[in-house]
């Protein structure tokens, strides 16, 4: 930073203009040395001569220098400054040292000038060319620093990109390794560790079978809207029905049980479902649980605990099917407090264990509901086109549905019904009670000739209930707490004792007609 020039200094400065100097940083070594020497000479010539007044003032200041030094030591080290005598009497070497100090410590010099100015010492007058030197050098340094910063940024960016690429490669390797490990584990599980639950193994084999079953003609895409393709939906339902149900030898492990005791148990379960206003599906699920438990259980079921089996089965089915199932304490009260809640829960664990946790079979009630929904015809719109209805909406009269449901309820009492699947029993009941036959075939997917044996078995029961209906003129039961559009789904009690003689007489009559080669008439 150049000091202010006095009038005397201006007189002694030569008027000749020196050529403009370039940046010393970019000059060769010899040129730099010569120019530094010239600068030192110029500075020496520009130092002002002191008069007597200035010398007296300087002596007074020198006398006080020791005092100021003492004060300055308290405040910190004094800033560096070059005395006037050193500039006046110094040699060329001293000037070179000063210039080297000034060129190396430019930043320190600016702070030193501020401190020296406050202490009253005059600053050496710097030529204007030095300012040009500083500006050019600072601009060059700035350019170099910017270039170096850019280089550093580029290097950092390259490093980051390399790290990202390495991480991506590592992730790909991890994914490949995980996939290989998963395949190895899966192959080990399939080969060395078979499914422990045999029921699940059968279900897995059937459900994963690629063979597709042709869907009935009435099962269109519109009726399966939101479910899936008709072929796939029907195939899954049929495969689910192929899971074996209980057989007629289900009481082989229970010597104290017989067919009559089983009928008594099912009769009581039906009465409980009616009193608690449970749905028909709940009753059919509970009976299925009881039958499969009796066939697979090694725990002997006797007259002392067979009611407990039915109670626990109802408790499980209600939790599976009902929105608001009764509590365990409610079922305990229905047994006249013969069993506690702990007894029911213990038996519940045993039932789900022995039936293999397979709690959702497609019962005959579900198949019948599906067939009737497929038989429903579409409604005409204003343009005289038929609109296909969703398969969830039943179209047949509820009274006919109730009559066929009672037939399926009664068939649960008979051991011989285990010979046939739920799907075929529901289709046979529909063949006997509904016309035309071609429509039933399109809804069930069966030809009538395929179900000849099943139809022969269910026909006497269907005719017995048709006679009973004409005598009693049954109506749909009404419940105050149940909505009218759901009342036909509530289980009703079928008087087994009054229906068994009628069914027996009908079977004898049909056998007599067949012996005479006569065919019975249609019911409806």
Curated annotation (Swiss-Prot):
Phenotype caused by lack of the gene: Loss of cell division in vulval lineages as a result of lengthened intervals between cell divisons. RNAi-mediated knockdown results in arrest prior to the 100-cell embryonic stage. Depending on the knockdown, some animals reach adult age. In the 1-cell embryo, persistent ruffling throughout the embryo cortex and mislocalization of par-2, which remains cytoplasmic, and par-6, which is distributed throughout the cortex. In 50 percent of embryos, the first division is symmetric. Adult mutants are sterile due to a lack of sperm and egg production.
User: Out of the domains of life, which is the source?
Assistant: Eukaryota
Q: Name one GO biological process term.
A: DNA endoreduplication
Q: Where is the composition biased (Basic and acidic residues)?
A: 18-47, 63-78, 86-95, 146-155
TM region(s), chain numbering: none
| SUPFAM superfamilies for this protein | Cyclin-like (SSF47954)
Q: Which residue ranges does the record annotate as region Disordered?
A: 1-155
Q: Which UniProt key words apply to this protein?
A: Cell cycle, Cell division, Cyclin, Cytoplasm, Cytoskeleton, Meiosis, Mitosis, Nucleus
Q: Name one Pfam family in it.
A: Cyclin_N
Q: Name one GO molecular function term.
A: cyclin-dependent protein serine/threonine kinase regulator activity
| Polar residues biased stretches | 48-62
Cell compartments where the protein resides? Nucleus; Cytoplasm, Cytoskeleton, Microtubule organizing center, Centrosome, Centriole
Q: Can you cite an annotated GO cellular component? A: cyclin E1-CDK2 complex
Cite the record's tissue specificity text: Expressed dynamically in proliferating cells throughout development. Detectable in larval blast cells undergoing active proliferation that give rise to all tissue types, including germline, intestine, hypodermis, neurons, and muscle.
The annotated subunit structure for this chain is: Interacts with a member of the CDK2/CDK protein kinases to form a serine/threonine kinase holoenzyme complex. The cyclin subunit imparts substrate specificity to the complex.
Free-text function comment from the UniProt entry: Essential for the control of the cell cycle at the G1/S (start) transition. In association with cdk-2, regulates proliferation, quiescent state and cell fate during the development of several cell lineages. In the embryo, initiates the establishment of cell polarity through the recruitment of the centrosomal proteins spd-2 and spd-5 during prophase. During the development of the vulva, controls the onset of vulval cell terminal differentiation by controlling the duration of G1 phase. During hypoderm development at early larval stages, controls syncytial fate of seam cell daughter cells.
The text of the family note is:
Belongs to the cyclin family. Cyclin E subfamily.
Query: Know the name of this protein?
Result: G1/S-specific cyclin-E
Q: Which organism is it from?
A: Caenorhabditis elegans
């Amino acid at each position: 930073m150049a000091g202010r020039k006095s009038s005397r200094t201006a007189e002694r400065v030569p008027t000749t203009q020196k050529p403009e100097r370039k940046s010393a940083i970019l000059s060769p070594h010899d040129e730099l040395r010569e120019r530094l020497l010239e600068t030192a000479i110029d500075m020496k010539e520009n130092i002002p001569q002191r008069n007597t007044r200035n010398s007296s003032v300087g002596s007074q200041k020198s006398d006080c220098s020791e005092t100021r030094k003492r004060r300055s030591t308290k405040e910190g080290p004094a800033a560096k400054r070059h005395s006037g005598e050193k500039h006046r009497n110094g040699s060329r070497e001293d000037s070179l040292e000063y210039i080297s100090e000034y060129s190396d410590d430019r930043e320190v010099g600016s702070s030193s000038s501020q401190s020296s100015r406050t202490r009253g010492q005059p600053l050496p007058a710097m030529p204007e060319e030095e300012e040009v030197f500083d500006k050019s050098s600072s601009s060059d340094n700035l350019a170099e620093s910017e270039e170096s910063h850019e280089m550093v940024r580029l290097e950092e960016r390259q490093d980051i990109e390399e790290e990202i690429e390495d991480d991506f490669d590592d992730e790909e390797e991890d994914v490949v390794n995980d996939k290989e490990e998963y395949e190895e584990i899966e192959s080990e599980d399939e080969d060395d560790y078979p499914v422990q639950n045999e029921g699940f193994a059968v279900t897995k084999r059937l459900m994963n079978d690629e063979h597709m079953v042709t869907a009935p003609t009435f099962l269109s895409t519109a009726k399966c809207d939101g479910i899936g393709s008709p072929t796939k939906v029907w195939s899954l339902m049929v495969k689910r029905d192929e899971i074996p149900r209980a057989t007629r030898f289900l009481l082989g492990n229970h010597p104290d049980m017989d067919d009559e005791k089983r009928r008594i148990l099912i009769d009581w379960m039906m009465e409980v479902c009616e009193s608690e206003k449970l749905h028909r599906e709940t009753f059919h699920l509970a009976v299925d649980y009881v039958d499969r438990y009796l066939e697979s259980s090694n725990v002997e079921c006797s007259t002392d605990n067979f009611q407990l089996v039915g109670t626990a089965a109802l408790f499980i089915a209600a939790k599976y099917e009902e929105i608001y199932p009764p509590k365990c304490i409610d079922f305990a009260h229905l047994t006249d407090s013969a069993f506690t809640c702990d007894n029911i829960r213990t038996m519940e664990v045993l039932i789900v264990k022995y039936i293999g946790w397979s709690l959702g079979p497609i019962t005959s009630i579900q198949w019948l509901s599906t067939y009737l929904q497929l038989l429903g015809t579409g409604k005409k719109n204003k343009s005289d086109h038929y609109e296909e209805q969703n398969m969830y909406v039943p179209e047949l009269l509820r009274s006919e549905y109730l009559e066929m449901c009672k037939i399926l309820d009664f068939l649960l009492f008979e051991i011989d019904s285990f010979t046939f699947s739920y799907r075929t029993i529901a289709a046979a009941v529909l063949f006997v009670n509904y016309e035309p036959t071609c429509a039933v075939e399109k809804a069930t997917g069966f030809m009538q000739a395929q179900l000849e044996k099943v139809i022969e078995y269910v026909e006497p029961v269907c005719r017995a209930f048709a006679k009973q209906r004409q005598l009693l003129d049954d109506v749909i039961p009404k419940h105050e707490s149940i909505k009218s559009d759901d009342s036909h789904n509530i289980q009703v009690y079928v008087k087994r004792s009054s229906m068994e003689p009628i069914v027996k007489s009908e079977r004898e009559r049909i056998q007599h007609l067949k012996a005479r080669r006569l065919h019975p008439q249609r019911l409806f």
